[in-house]
UniProtKB/Swiss-Prot annotation:
It comes from Takifugu rubripes. This is Protein HIRA. WD repeats lie at residues 11-53, 68-107, 129-168, 172-211, 220-263, 266-322, 326-367. Pfam families: Beta-prop_CAF1B_HIR1, Hira, HIRA_B. GO terms for cellular component: chromatin; HIR complex; nucleus. The keyword Transcription applies. It comes from the Eukaryota. Keywords: Chromatin regulator, Nucleus, Repeat, Repressor, Transcription, Transcription regulation, WD repeat.
């Protein structure tokens, strides 16, 4: 054995916490503390291996130095193929580095040109999720996953094929997690923490396999790291700091039953790091000796806080070698060469040591074929994971139905990969022509546009030179992990992912605008009254977008990235249904809003004839959007109009929301006499809310149904009989007309295919059938009607006294009786912006603060169904759970009230750094809220839609408990019982039919095949019965 301590490997006296040798053995990386930041350094291995190379000045020793980490680097690890280097530090970040192929040497910043970076390594992605220092990182055997652990007590598994996607977050440790290691066959990952436990996790479902605590019960959190290691044959897991009879040991955990009967003993202080040699050895045959069968064995190195290093062979009871006082401080990390004969050790004293062994000392290493043969004999076929998804290829599919769903999913994945991607050339972009969605020629042109040109007094041009470095396209190679380069700003978004979501934009829409990677899109949310605008600035030759968004106009958000475009397309029938239930007040729009209306309408989609018709109808309809007035005793309520033209943002707001129709302030202005008549008493606590009432028009026309076509015509004061002024209501239904007379002027009217209702100035409500027959006697309202809606055979009235009532005309029964809106109208600044009545008779009210409520008939209370400012909406992300064949829902009341708000929220969350685990939990809560809201609204179509998305989300996230509970509820009792209260249907949908739709979704994930088989068999049993 040879021992060398290269003095030139140093972090300027600062501690070195990690070391790792490149798989090809030509270089090694160190990580530790820098001057004022974390430091990652890559060194040449040749001067370590050969003395002549160390003395040769032409052979560089340091290859690269990276100071991107803001705090100390605790771990560096090369990927198994050697293309990537991962580093984790106290700045809570995991950085993945790749060599820049086409950039030449450069000097290290701040080194006075003494240190030169021979190789250029740049950070290709930053993984953000941990909330504490990252202590260890580790690549899985086939580079499918990258694991990181932290002092936040969690282990995060990253999808190394799709950085920065997170696969899962393993929770269970109650102390700082300080070490990770992968099972060499990819079935388990083990972690060790300060909570006196070593935990083993399964990779098939990311659940805990074993929790080993006994050997660690006496341990204290005295070590900086706990780097455990798995033997190359997979049979043994050796922990770091353990105790046996109050003495420090390295505990040996057997894979079979996770028994802890053996340990490595001898170190005087706590063991900090254990590292197995990657090779499996057999005894070396002497010259001329006949080969004798011998059991393969492994080699393990153990480092401790006592500054000593021991090397063990599993075929010997005592260590092969022990080196005392190798360093001045604790040993922090160990790394073996891939040949198995060299080892690097680093210490907190800032130095490293290299140990070179011979074959006589360790034995003959087995070839890779022999090593794989051992794995196959013990575990079956080795895990050759080639699928992009974290599914193990060795998992046996036990159910033929499951096999069918797996094949269908594979076929759909191939079909979605693109019709033109038939060959390798079409599937992979050319590296020398495209980078991050822009051609290199475009990038050069954009850079040239940044040149500053001035002219001297004599007229000569002076151009300031602009350095254009050679563009490095090697960084953007999609060969490994299919990973896209990150934005220079640190954001993990990439334009390369743009094509992954199918675009459903109509021909009339503008294509998405391209954003350069160096520019961060800004999302600025002004008050809701402002209209949506897109300001384009062509400075620097690039279109930069400034988004001013309102609650309902989110179209320009496509300009950021087509990944975030999930537009809701209203069907013609849905548009008609919504229009028929809006209860609009007859009035004409103010003249000043007409130009703006035309401008906006030219930008919107008018793809169907019915939508054009509805736009024409809504042109003559209006609904008040003024804030509710607080009528107090003696308080004068006078609204002064400002001189001049109204503000543009207020005009745009009058047409921005599709379900809100506005009128001019003059039409809704209360009379000054009425306001002055209130007196001048001091305001009291018993302030009454008052909603505005429609103004009386001489005549108006209202189309309330498209199929069949129902048109209402109202003409006030058509004649005077015996001093009474009569008004006429005429209804045209499929060419058949009927009319009736009313003793008072009509304020508003509404109708459906079943009933017609009118509210009069004398606070009377009249209800007629579709043929003109009066169905109910005139209903006396407490206050004048503010809004009126009809849907099917239900009638809803919202009065100016802020009360709401709903009647079932067929049953002649009140479903909601004078329910006050006081509980939801909190504050004088909140007003009713829209209202509607569903086909099932459920009233819905939308407020100006972005919240929407419906009155639950069963709970008899107001329930919140939408909130534009809800943080759950801001972070919900279920794009991966949307079925490919379904368009975004647009026909239900829930979608009508929410609009595109949650699309905007998810876009905003992309521009911020929301932790993935938090986004995961909030998405789950959001989907459950959607299910509950659809159930309250009695919207069967939307309930089924969100149920399938919810089930797919649970399957993708591996939430077995919730998924099992959902399936159990849908299945119901298998055997009949007198005590069961299970309802076989919900909203008219058979629950077991819904379960049959959910099961194929469950069948897409192999980890749930037992759950799939269990409920599939029970459904078949019930069907046979």
């Amino acid at each position: 054995m040879k021992l060398l301590k290269p003095s030139w490997v140093s972090h300027n006296g600062k501690p070195i916490f990690s070391v790792d040798i490149h798989p090809d053995g030509t270089k090694f990386a160190t990580g530790g503390q820098g001057e004022d930041s974390g430091k990652v350094m890559i060194w040449n291995m040749a001067p370590v291996l050969k003395e002549e190379d160390e003395k040769n000045e032409n052979v560089p020793k340091m290859l690269c130095q990276m100071d991107n980490h803001l705090a100390c680097v605790n771990c560096v690890r090369w990927s198994n193929n050697g293309l990537y280097l991962a580093s984790g530090g106290d700045d809570k970040l995991v950085m993945v580095w790749k060599r820049a192929a086409l950039i030449g040497p450069s000097t290290v910043f701040g080194s006075s040109n003494k240190l030169a970076n021979v190789e250029q390594w740049r950070c290709v992605t930053i993984l953000r999720n941990h909330t504490g220092d990252v202590m260890d990182v580790s690549w899985s055997p086939h580079d499918v996953w990258l694991a990181s652990c932290s002092v936040d007590n969690t282990i995060v598994i990253w999808n190394a094929r799709k950085f920065p996607e997170m696969v899962t977050c393993l929770r269970g440790h109650t102390g700082l997690v300080k070490g990770l290691t992968w099972d060499p066959v990819g079935k388990y990952i083990a972690s060790q923490a300060d909570d006196h436990s070593l935990r083993v996790w399964r990779t098939v479902d990311w659940q805990m396999e074993a929790n080993i605590t006994k050997p660690f019960s006496e341990c204290g959190g005295t070590t900086h790291v706990l780097r455990l290691s798995w033997s190359p044959d997979g049979q043994y897991l050796v922990s770091a700091h353990a105790m046996n009879n109050s003495g420090p040991t390295a505990q040996i955990v057997e894979r079979d039953g996770w028994r802890t009967n053996m340990d490595f003993v001898g170190h005087r202080k706590a063991v900090t790091v254990v590292k197995f040699n990657p090779k499996i050895f057999k005894k070396k045959q002497k010259n001329g000796g006949s080969p004798k069968p011998s059991c393969p064995y492994c080699c393990c190195a153990v480092g401790s806080k006592d500054r000593s290093l021991s090397v063990w062979l599993t075929s010997l009871k005592r260590p092969l070698v022990v080196i005392h006082d190798l360093f001045d401080k604790s040993i922090m990390d160990i790394s073996w060469t891939l040949t198995g004969l060299g080892m690097l050790v680093c210490s907190m004293d800032g130095t490293v040591a290299y140990l070179d062994f011979s074959l006589d000392e360790l034995g003959d290493p087995l070839s890779e074929e022999e090593k794989n043969s051992i794995h196959q004999n013990i575990y079956g076929k080795s895990l050759a994971i080639t699928n992009t998804e974290p599914q193990l290829s060795t998992t046996i599919i036990e159910n033929p139905e499951m096999l069918k769903y797996q094949q269908e999913r594979r076929n759909s994945t191939q079909a979605n990969s693109g019709p033109g991607a038939t060959g390798s050339e079409s599937a992979t972009p050319k590296l020398n022509s495209v980078m991050n969605g822009e051609s290199l020629e475009d990038i050069r042109k954009n850079l040239l546009k940044k040149q500053v040109e001035t002219r001297t007094p004599d007229g000569r041009r002076r151009i300031t030179p602009l350095c254009i470095a050679q563009l490095d396209t090697g960084d953007f190679s999609p060969a490994l992990f299919n990973s896209a380069p990150i934005l220079p700003s640190g954001s993990s978004m990439s334009n390369q992912l743009t094509s992954q979501l199918s675009s459903d934009s109509s021909p009339g829409q503008a294509p998405p605008l391209g954003l350069r990677p160096s520019q961060d899109p800004m999302l600025i949310s002004p008050p809701p009254s402002s209209a949506a605008k897109v300001l384009e600035d062509n400075k620097d030759g690039v279109k930069s977008c400034l988004l001013l968004t309102s609650a309902s106009k989110i179209e320009p958000m496509k300009a950021l990235d087509s990944r975030f475009t999930e537009r809701s397309k209203a069907t013609p029938g849905a548009t008609a249904a919504i229009a028929s239930s809006t209860g609009l007040t007859p009035s004409e729009r103010p003249k000043e809003s007409t130009p703006m209306q035309k401008d906006v309408k030219s930008k919107e989609d008018t793809s169907s004839d019915s939508e054009d018709k509805m736009a024409t109808i809504n042109k003559n309809l209006a609904f008040n959007k003024r804030k509710p007035e607080l009528l107090m005793d003696g308080a004068e309520v006078v609204e002064k109009r400002k001189k001049g033209r109204p503000r543009k943002d207020k005009m745009a707001a009058s047409i921005a929301q599709p379900l809100t129709q506005t009128t001019s302030p003059a039409e809704r202005e209360p009379s000054r006499a009425a306001a002055a008549g209130a007196g001048a008493a001091a305001p009291t606590a018993a302030a009454a809310l008052k909603l505005p009432t429609p103004s009386i028009k001489k005549a108006f026309t209202l189309q309330v149904s498209m199929d069949p076509s129902v048109v209402l015509e109202v003409e006030n004061e058509v004649s005077v009989v015996a001093g009474s002024r009569l008004s006429q209501l005429r209804c045209s239904r499929d060419g058949r007309d009927w009319n009736t007379l009313l003793p008072s002027s009509v304020l508003t009217a509404a109708g459906s295919s079943d009933v017609v209702a009118v509210a009069s100035q004398d606070r009377m409500l009249s209800v007629f059938s579709s043929c003109g027959r009066r169905l109910l006697p005139a209903i006396q309202l407490a206050t004048p009607a503010s809004a009126l809606h009809c849907s099917a055979h239900f009638v809803m009235v919202l009065t100016s006294g802020a009360t709401l009532s709903v009647w079932d005309v067929h049953k002649q029964k009140a479903l909601v009786k004078n329910e006050s809106l006081l509980t939801i109208l909190s504050g004088a600044a909140v007003t009713v912006s829209q209202s509607m009545l569903t086909q099932q008779g459920v009233p819905v009210v939308g407020l100006s603060n972005g919240k929407s409520y419906c009155f639950s008939l069963s709970l008899e209370t107001w329930t919140l169904i939408a909130d534009t400012a809800d943080s759950l909406v801001q972070c919900a992300d279920f794009r991966n759970c949307l079925p490919n064949q379904d368009a975004p829902m647009s026909s239900g009341p829930l979608a009508a009230m929410q609009g595109r708000n949650f699309n905007a929220g998810r876009l905003a969350s992309r521009l911020s750094s929301t932790p993935h685990h938090l986004q995961q939990s909030m998405t789950l809560a959001f989907l459950e809220n959607q299910l509950a809201s659809a159930l309250t609204l009695q919207s069967a179509q939307e309930y089924r839609y969100w149920l399938l998305i919810y089930a797919r989300f649970l399957v993708n996230e591996g939430s077995e408990y919730r998924l099992r509970e959902l399936c159990k509820e849908l299945l119901g009792p298998v055997h009949k019982s007198a005590t069961t209260s299970w309802e076989p249907t919900t909203l008219g949908l058979r629950k077991r039919d819904l379960l049959r739709e959910v099961l194929p979704v469950v069948g897409e994930n192999l980890r749930f095949q037992r759950l799939f088989t269990e409920y599939q068999d029970q459904l078949e049993l019930l069907r046979n019965k």
